Amino acid sequence: MTALESVATYLPSGRVPIEDLAGQLELTPMQVKLFRRYHRLAEVRREPDGTLLDLLLAAVANLDGLRGREHEIRYVLHARTFPVVVPYPVNPVHALCRILGLDHAVAFAVTHHACATGLLALDVAGRLLAHDGDGLALVLAGEKTFTRDAQLVPETSVFGEGASACLVRHAGPRDRLLAYAAHVRGEFDDELSDDPSAYQREYHSSLADVILDAAAQAHTGLGEVQLILPHNVNVVAWQRLCRRIGYPISQVLLDNVPVAGHVFCADAFLNYQTARERGLLRPGDRYIVAAAGAGRGATFSAMVFEH
């Protein structure tokens, strides 16, 4: 049973208010007000002089569980929202492996589930490790806002920079994965769809369905779920979803939305770290990690863990 061994995160110190992004993102004053007052997106983190490699290395530097165990790493996975995250031929994951002495590991990117790819990467890592005994996988997430598409989800969210690093093993006592559900919806194609608004109309019901699917697979009622760790798209989306499924919004960890924005696939790990730091999870607690990603189709994903 896949388990999280250790999680670390990194957020740049540079804070950029939403208002300061209006010019480059071509936002009207009304759109800025909508993001701040309605979606509760106040600022994002940026590191203008840093590279993606810098972001990932900073997260790994905080991963105490890796030190002295580099030889146990079998796989290094980079969960990406976008298939292309750096200009060719730059390869930050291979560079990271060289720097950290992980050249022996199989390193590759996981993508095409957009912002839900972080959950896919955990699942892939666990499946690979099932054949590797006591080996570990290093799952990385985080991207640079180096294109306009990587800065803004129109009318919905603003991307921020940051990164996470997670050690995964096939089985273990800490944060055991009980269930994973992923619903891939190819009809929600933002370029080829005859009805571009269909994704927005069905977003809440689709995300609710996958959360309930994962909970059912884990034989867990929502009343037994201590916490939901969301993707940080905005606050109002989760308020609506909670009303739909009858789950208390107070048990959805949304504190990082106003101060970090939507940090690509790293949201779940940032929120996990916050939950640990604040003592929101006790041994035996069950929690759900949920995310949705859109682009060439859409993916709605949820995982149930036991802390």
Residue ranges with predicted function:
Residues V84-V90, D103, T111-G133, L227-H307:
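Claisen-condensing/thiolase-fold acyl-transfer catalytic domains that form or cleave C-C bonds
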Residues A130-G162:
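Flexible, glycine-rich active-site loops centered on histidine and acidic residues
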Residues T111, A137-E143, V168, V289-A292:
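Short beta-strand segments
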Residues T51-R67, E202-A218, L270-A275:
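Short, well-ordered amphipathic alpha-helical segments that serve as non-catalytic structural scaffolds
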Residues A141, E187-D189, V235:
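Acyl-CoA/ACP chain-elongation machinery
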